[in-house]
UniProtKB/Swiss-Prot annotation:
Cellular localisation: Nucleus
Oligomer and partners: Interacts with ZNF260. Interacts with the homeobox domain of NKX2-5 through its C-terminal zinc finger. Also interacts with JARID2 which represses its ability to activate transcription of ANF. Interacts (via the second Zn finger) with NFATC4. Interacts with LMCD1. Forms a complex made of CDK9, CCNT1/cyclin-T1, EP300 and GATA4 that stimulates hypertrophy in cardiomyocytes. Interacts with NR5A1, ZFPM2 and TBX5. Interacts with TBX18. Interacts with GLYR1; the interaction is required for a synergistic activation of GATA4 target genes transcription.
Protein name in UniProt: Transcription factor GATA-4
Zinc finger (GATA-type): 216-240, 270-294
Keyword Protein transport: no
Biological process, per Gene Ontology: atrial septum primum morphogenesis; atrioventricular canal development; atrioventricular valve formation; atrioventricular valve morphogenesis; cardiac muscle cell differentiation; cardiac muscle cell proliferation; cardiac muscle hypertrophy in response to stress; cardiac muscle tissue development
Regulation: induction: By retinoic acid.
GO cellular component, one term: chromatin
Region (Disordered): 60-107, 313-392
Gene symbol of the encoding locus: Gata4
Post-translational modification: Methylation at Lys-299 attenuates transcriptional activity.
Length: 441
């Protein structure tokens, strides 16, 4: 019953016998035609069954014989020498008749013992053939009347079998995928040559930024830290884009020229003296530009500045520095201010006497409140005490002798005041003692 298994042990499989597990590899030879093993119909999509490589390209298969067994229709085998012209399947007639491939999938290492296992293996092989696009094989006339394809016609019609076959399958599958767009939409179909327009990878846009040379439409910059776009979609560099965003206008390409100084303003000349250089441009009553000199002259005098006063250069004032150390006048022993020119600067004693007497006359003296009641003339008393303060040791005899009214001793003391020219620091203390003596006497 299982002669094919014994034959498979003696003879090794020829090259290409298990190529992708095609259904033709499980067909028995003529010697095993009476075997009751059933080979099911391969489950190949209808779009693949109508391909050109399944039609023609080999010798006609022999008519299958039907055996009256419980397994159903018997397999039909190919005659000896059917595939002698094929380079991959060519073998001798005796060997081709004797060899019969095992009815199991090459994935299993043990032979099938029942018909159901062989049928399941054949079905799995058929699914693999349909999935990987390597299906097809020899089928008898009893199995839908299909013919066994051969390599001679296939190789003869195409220069390179695999690319042409893949292109044909890819085109047909692309058409089926376009019709259904469901089970055929897989990454494998995207890589087929027959795929019409594969989807664009989203990351390719990122590479376009490096491959495509962008240029700023405003300034023509080729590189920038950040590319921006204006309202119309044109590319702008970072500087031009920020300028347009903040100001609403295009960034100026040429830097604006620096404003000329007022002294050299282009196109201006004084309407009165026709000078072109001035520190300040003014306007007259008519609105015409005039130089600073003519404008000030007209403002101060009310008449135009005479042309004879025009000078080629600009005359500027020599301003005095603001931080000048003011000269401080020397102070006297009691804190009063003395004139800067004292008697020591001149050898004339009369000048020294007159200056000291004038300062003594203007010097006030503190008096107690009781003095004004005893002495009615406070001014004469102040002069008297200021004059007496310069005499020094002779203060006590003079004051003790003059115990009269203020009118009596004012005149002799005033006469002696002309000769007083020296002041001592202790005169104020002596005056206080003598004053106390006068008040208490």
């Amino acid at each position: 019953m299982y002669q094919s298994l014994a034959m498979a042990a003696n003879h090794g499989p020829p090259p290409g016998a298990y190529e992708a597990g095609g259904p033709g590899a499980f067909m028995h030879s003529a010697g095993a035609a009476s075997s009751p093993v059933y080979v099911p119909t391969p489950r190949v999509p209808s779009s693949v069954l109508g391909l050109s490589y399944l039609q023609g390209g080999g010798s006609a298969a022999a008519a299958g014989t039907t055996s009256g067994g419980s397994s159903g229709a018997g397999p039909s085998g190919a005659g000896p020498g059917t595939q002698q012209g094929s380079p991959g399947w060519s073998q001798a007639g005796a060997e081709g008749a004797a060899y019969t491939p095992p009815p199991v999938s090459p994935r299993f290492s043990f032979p099938g013992t029942t018909g159901s296992l062989a049928a399941a293996a054949a079905a799995a092989a058929a699914r693999e053939a349909a999935a990987y696009g390597s299906g097809g094989g020899a089928a008898g006339a009893g199995l839908a009347g299909r013919e066994q394809y051969g390599r001679p016609g296939f190789a003869g019609s195409y220069s390179s079998p695999y690319p042409a076959y893949m292109a044909d399958v890819g085109a047909s599958w692309a058409a089926a995928a376009a019709a259904s767009a469901g089970p055929f939409d897989s990454p494998v179909l995207h890589s087929l040559p027959g795929r019409a327009n594969p989807g664009r990878h989203p990351n390719l846009d990122m590479f376009d930024d490096f491959s495509e040379g962008r240029e700023c439409v405003n300034c023509g910059a080729m590189s920038t830290p950040l590319w921006r776009r204006d309202g119309t979609g044109h590319y702008l560099c970072n500087a031009c884009g920020l300028y347009h965003k903040m100001n609403g206008i295009n960034r100026p390409l040429i830097k604006p020229q620096r404003r000329l100084s007022a002294s050299r303003r282009v196109g201006l000349s004084c309407a009165n003296c026709q000078t072109t250089t001035t520190t300040l441009w003014r306007r007259n009553a008519e609105g015409e530009p005039v130089c600073n000199a003519c404008g000030l002259y007209m403002k101060l005098h009310g008449v135009p500045r005479p042309l004879a006063m025009r000078k080629e250069g600009i005359q500027t004032r020599k301003r005095k520095p603001k931080n000048l150390n003011k000269s401080k006048t020397p102070a006297g022993p009691a804190g009063e201010t003395l004139p800067p020119s004292s008697g020591a600067s001149s050898g004339n004693s009369s000048n020294a006497t007159s200056s000291s007497s004038s300062s003594e006359e203007m010097r006030p003296i503190k008096t107690e409140p009781g003095l004004s009641s005893h002495y009615g003339h406070s001014s004469s008393m102040s002069q008297t005490f200021s004059t007496v303060s310069g005499h020094g040791p002779s203060i006590h005899p003079v004051l003790s002798a003059l115990k009269l009214s203020p009118q009596g001793y004012a005149s002799p003391v005033t006469q002696t005041s002309q000769a007083s020219s020296k002041q001592d620091s202790w005169n104020s203390l002596v005056l206080a003692d003598s004053h106390g003596d006068i008040i208490t006497a």
